[in-house]
């Protein structure tokens, strides 16, 4: 193929033919570029980040039911302040105010006799521990955060001791937390209740499903067992006439559903990783705990002691 080129000769332009094949030893003046400039644009088809599902046993090609749950994200180091220590102080103050507000609320309902005393006591039983867990994401990811959180139920241990021993008189607290209005009752169930939540916060904290199982079965499970059992518990369990089938079923159901709710809640903050295996584990823990609660020995000891101990023991095996 022949090409035309212009060369500058003596200041003028001359038209000459140029044969690229014949020109071997010299570089041609006019030579089309052999390469084209390339431009790199990000393409969504070249690399795509893998989604992280709450239920990790399901892949992106699995059933669409897993997309109902939010993805697990890494937990934030602090939520209320850039300094973790200051953030945990704020979180402790907020959690304490929230817990105290609900305690005062139920003390007022007990004082005004808005509810039956037994119902009022169980409403306190159900709400306080679950509200405490709702505040857990406010705390930082530092190792000391669990001790800050444990201060809230830990203070209640001290309150139960001084009131139960008669050192301090608090009729509103006694009426809202005791069965028969005896201040010495606070040394049993209410004290075990506060101790369970305190130890669960320190030992297991929000990163362990065992803590979820223990608190949810203690609060929601045991609380609903009493409420439902008193109203629908006509048919008693053969081996324990003080317990009913309705109460035991309500306990297992409430403990299980609440555990699933808090599994999703803490998973959304990245503290634990939910899975269908964990769902099955929570179900088994709630069933076994409800069965132990229905035994006569649970009545002789205290539900606030046997329920969390069973949840922790069974949870340590299967969760």
From Swiss-Prot:
Protein name: Probable phytol kinase 3, chloroplastic
Transit peptide boundaries: 1-22
Pathway assignment: Cofactor biosynthesis; tocopherol biosynthesis
Subcellular location: Plastid, Chloroplast membrane
Single GO molecular function: phytol kinase activity
Organism: Glycine max
Entry function: Involved in the activation and reutilization of phytol from chlorophyll degradation in plant metabolism, including tocopherol biosynthesis. Catalyzes the conversion of phytol to phytol monophosphate (PMP).
Gene Ontology process terms (BP): vitamin E biosynthetic process
Record-listed E.C. numbers: 2.7.1.182
Keyword set, alphabetical order: Chloroplast, Kinase, Membrane, Plastid, Transferase, Transit peptide, Transmembrane, Transmembrane helix
């Amino acid at each position: 193929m022949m090409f035309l080129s212009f060369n500058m000769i003596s200041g003028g332009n001359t038209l000459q033919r140029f044969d690229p094949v014949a020109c071997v030893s010299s570089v041609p003046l006019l030579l089309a570029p052999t390469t084209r400039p390339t431009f790199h644009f990000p393409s969504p088809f070249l690399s795509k980040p893998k989604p992280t599902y709450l239920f990790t046993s399901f892949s992106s090609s699995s059933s669409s039911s897993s997309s109902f749950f939010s993805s697990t994200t890494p937990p934030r180091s602090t939520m209320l302040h850039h300094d973790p220590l200051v953030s945990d102080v704020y979180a402790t103050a907020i959690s304490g105010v929230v817990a105290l507000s609900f305690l005062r609320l139920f003390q007022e309902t007990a004082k005004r006799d808005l509810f039956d005393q037994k119902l009022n006591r169980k409403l306190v039983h159900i709400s306080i521990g679950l509200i405490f867990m709702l505040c857990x994401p406010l705390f930082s990811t530092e190792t000391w955060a669990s001790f800050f959180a444990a201060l809230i139920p830990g203070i209640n241990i001290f309150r139960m001791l001084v009131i139960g021993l008669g050192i301090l008189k608090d009729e509103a607290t006694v009426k809202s937390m005791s069965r028969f209005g005896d201040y010495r009752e606070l040394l049993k169930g209410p004290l075990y209740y506060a101790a369970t939540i305190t130890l669960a916060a320190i030992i297991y904290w929000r990163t362990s499903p065992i803590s979820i199982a223990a608190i949810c079965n203690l609060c929601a499970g045991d609380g609903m067992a009493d409420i439902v059992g008193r109203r629908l518990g006509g048919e008693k369990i053969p081996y324990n006439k003080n317990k009913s089938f309705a109460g035991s079923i309500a306990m297992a159901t409430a403990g299980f559903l609440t555990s699933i709710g808090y599994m999703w809640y803490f998973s959304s903050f990245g503290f634990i990783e939910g899975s269908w295996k964990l769902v099955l584990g929570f179900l088994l823990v709630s069933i076994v705990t409800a069965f132990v609660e229905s035994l006569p020995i649970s009545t002789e000891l205290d539900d606030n002691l046997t329920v969390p101990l069973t949840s922790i023991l069974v949870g340590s095996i299967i969760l």
